[in-house]
């Protein structure tokens, strides 16, 4: 009996895709710290993280409901709860909707209405626009659909300030440009899975050379965008962004050259290291804010 209950609980947890949520929440804290230069109340941070977790869990759960048919086809996703019938589809839908409503009400109560509305917008965009419209129709699915994954920085900033500014927009764009290289590198490895499921990911419909060229272009856009925040951040962020950006661009160029040269291609290496890149850059931003270091802009003025 206990084993069955535990299995059911784990199935519902798996619906939320916790590993995906982890990285998204990593971006929320630095955005909040930057918004008030490290003076944010810890209770507000924890409340925003909890509300953001519920919102992301809602979006991921509803995504699993819509994608249950293709999850059964793809080897990478065949063990997801709905793909193996561990959770009834109707229960998963109610679970996802309940989390979504709870996240809105929680953030409205603990932060402000703007933060709550941004979470609702994120859930709606991810499920209705990305999952139901873009994902199975165009190779640009992850380009525009990835905007949902950029929203935690907007939620975090608005939870502190009750408004939006250019800084969270820059952070939004960093994640926006980061998403295609991150996702396409994974899709290169699981190309046959996506092809079998009828999902037109770029690696499915284009040559590896074209894919790696696009990865390279988006990587450059990501690094250049990250540098535009340097005047509003401190020297730690500036140094970390320069080093991490150069390192990531080197890996992207290596992947492109290996494809052009006919060498063994290892896209998963770029996929895994892209997680490290994003984490390092945002941690650098958080350290700057917590230490209360002078911004680069003030040092140069």
Swiss-Prot record:
Q: Superkingdom of this entry's organism?
A: Bacteria
Please name the taxonomic classification of the source.
Answer: Bacteria, Bacillati, Actinomycetota, Actinomycetes, Mycobacteriales
Alphabetically, the GO molecular function entries are: protoheme IX farnesyltransferase activity
In its miscellaneous comment, the UniProt entry states: Carbon 2 of the heme B porphyrin ring is defined according to the Fischer nomenclature.
Topology in the lipid bilayer is annotated as:
Multi-pass membrane protein
Give the top-level enzyme category.
Answer: transferase
Where does this protein reside within or beyond the cell? Cell membrane
**Protein name stated in the entry:** Protoheme IX farnesyltransferase
């Amino acid at each position: 009996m206990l084993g069955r209950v535990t299995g059911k609980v784990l199935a519902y947890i798996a619906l939320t895709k916790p590993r995906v949520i982890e990285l998204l929440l990593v971006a929320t804290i630095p955005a909040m710290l930057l918004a008030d230069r490290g003076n944010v109340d810890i209770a507000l941070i924890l409340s925003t993280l909890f509300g953001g977790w519920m919102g992301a869990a809602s979006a991921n759960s509803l995504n699993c409901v819509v994608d249950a048919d293709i999850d059964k086809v793809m080897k990478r996703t065949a063990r997801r709860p709905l793909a193996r019938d561990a959770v009834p589809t109707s229960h998963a839908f109610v679970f996802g909707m309940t989390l979504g409503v709870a996240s809105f009400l929680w953030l409205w109560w603990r932060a402000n209405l703007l933060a709550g509305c941004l979470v609702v917008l994120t859930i709606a965009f991810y499920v209705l626009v990305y999952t139901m419209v873009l994902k199975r129709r165009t190779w640009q699915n992850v380009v525009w659909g990835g905007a949902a994954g950029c929203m935690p920085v907007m939620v975090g900033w608005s939870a502190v300030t009750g408004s939006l500014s250019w800084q969270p927009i820059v952070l939004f764009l960093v994640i926006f440009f980061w998403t295609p290289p991150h996702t396409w590198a994974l899709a290169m490895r699981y190309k046959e899975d996506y092809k079998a499921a009828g999902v037109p990911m770029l690696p499915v419909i284009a040559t590896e050379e074209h894919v790696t060229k696009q990865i390279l272009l988006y990587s450059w856009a990501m690094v250049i965008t990250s540098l535009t925040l340097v005047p509003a951040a401190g020297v730690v962020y500036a140094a970390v962004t320069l080093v991490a950006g150069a390192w990531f661009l080197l890996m992207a160029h290596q992947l492109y050259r290996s494809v052009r040269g006919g060498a063994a291609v290892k896209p998963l290496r770029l996929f895994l290291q892209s997680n490290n890149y994003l984490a390092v850059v945002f941690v650098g931003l958080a350290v700057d804010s917590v230490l209360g270091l002078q911004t680069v802009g003030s040092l140069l003025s």
